[in-house]
Amino acid sequence: MICMSRKPSPTRRTRIHRFHKGSCGRKLVGLTCYDFSTARVLSDCELDFLLVGDSASGVIYGYENTGSVCLDEIIYLAAGVVRGAPNSFIIVDLPFGTYEKSDELAVETAIEVIKRTGASAVKLEGGARMACRISAIVRAGVPVMGHIGFTPQTINALGGYKIQGRDNADLIYLDAQAVEQAGAFAVVMEMVTEDLAKTITSEIKITTIGVGAGRYTDGQLLVINDLIGLSEKKITFAPRYASIDNTVASCVKLWRKDVLEGNFPQKDHIPA
């Protein structure tokens, strides 16, 4: 299959300046997004960025862990998001196994993502151990967002789903410095203690984005499914602002009832 390349629009590309620390004078706000229709809605919500996250592994594809999603699966989703929100700053996660092996592999993957989706930047997990990969991708001309603290792709190595920074604060602090020095334009801190996140935010020069990392990061990011109530699990740091799952179920049941009772379709539902 021949795959046409897409070039990011100048509008999306220039918005990376919004991530310069303190340039907005307010918190940056972002959500994950996985499809065209949702992207179209979110494009009018004054968000600073959208992330096509590898969290799609569970919430979209139904895999048991984040590491199961493959590159093509992420790329297909990201291309739809870019089409739905053409003027948004869109970041795409590099899936597990697509960048760790070598600088060359990391660069190839990052460039493929940008060329095939038209996204603005990529995100990868890992601090000091991935600094070389970040530097290589940045040198190749692709903006990189880092990700430290709890890193879902390596959940087994972290000993499960738990808060980071209680007994490894020094290592996470060094990770933040390494990501900054490698040339990342921002860094996600996931499930990091609030005090550590506050310290890191005050001492590094790149923008920090918190995911369950307290009140003092430069910005906040959540999985949209958690925010709108379209996920089975309730996450402590992600309050539900709606219950879309219940709304959808109610609509479907009402429509089914109308069909069975002969109330659908009515005359105005029939094409002329």
UniProtKB/Swiss-Prot annotation:
Please state where this protein is localized: Cytoplasm
The entry's Mg(2+)-binding residues are: 54, 93, 125
Catalytic activity as recorded in UniProt: 3-methyl-2-oxobutanoate + (6R)-5,10-methylene-5,6,7,8-tetrahydrofolate + H2O = 2-dehydropantoate + (6S)-5,6,7,8-tetrahydrofolate
According to the UniProt entry, what is the EC number of this protein?
2.1.2.11
Q: Does the keyword Protein biosynthesis apply?
A: no
Q: Annotated pathway, please?
A: Cofactor biosynthesis; (R)-pantothenate biosynthesis; (R)-pantoate from 3-methyl-2-oxobutanoate: step 1/2
Under the heading InterPro entries, the entry gives: Pantoate_hydroxy_MeTrfase, Pyrv/PenolPyrv_kinase-like_dom, Pyrv_kinase-like_dom_sf
What domain of life is recorded for the organism? Answer: Bacteria
Give GO cellular component annotations, separated by semicolons. cytoplasm
Gene3D superfamilies in the record, alphabetically? Phosphoenolpyruvate-binding domains (3.20.20.60)
Q: How is the cofactor bound?
A: Binds 1 Mg(2+) ion per subunit.
- Locate the residues binding 3-methyl-2-oxobutanoate: 54-55, 93, 123
**What is one Pfam family matched by this protein?**
Pantoate_transf
One GO term (biological process) = pantothenate biosynthetic process
Catalytic residues identified in the record:
190 (proton acceptor)
Enzyme type, top EC level: transferase
Q: Which keywords does this Swiss-Prot/TrEMBL entry list?
A: Cytoplasm, Magnesium, Metal-binding, Pantothenate biosynthesis, Transferase
Which cofactors must be present for this protein to function?
Answer: Mg(2+)
Q: Does the keyword Transferase apply?
A: yes
Any one GO molecular function term: magnesium ion binding
PANTHER family named among the record's database cross-references: 3-METHYL-2-OXOBUTANOATE HYDROXYMETHYLTRANSFERASE
Function of the protein = Catalyzes the reversible reaction in which hydroxymethyl group from 5,10-methylenetetrahydrofolate is transferred onto alpha-ketoisovalerate to form ketopantoate.
Family affiliation: Belongs to the PanB family.
User: Quaternary form?
Assistant: Homodecamer; pentamer of dimers.
Q: What is this protein called?
A: 3-methyl-2-oxobutanoate hydroxymethyltransferase
Species assigned in the record: Tropheryma whipplei (strain Twist)
Lineage runs: Bacteria, Bacillati, Actinomycetota, Actinomycetes, Micrococcales
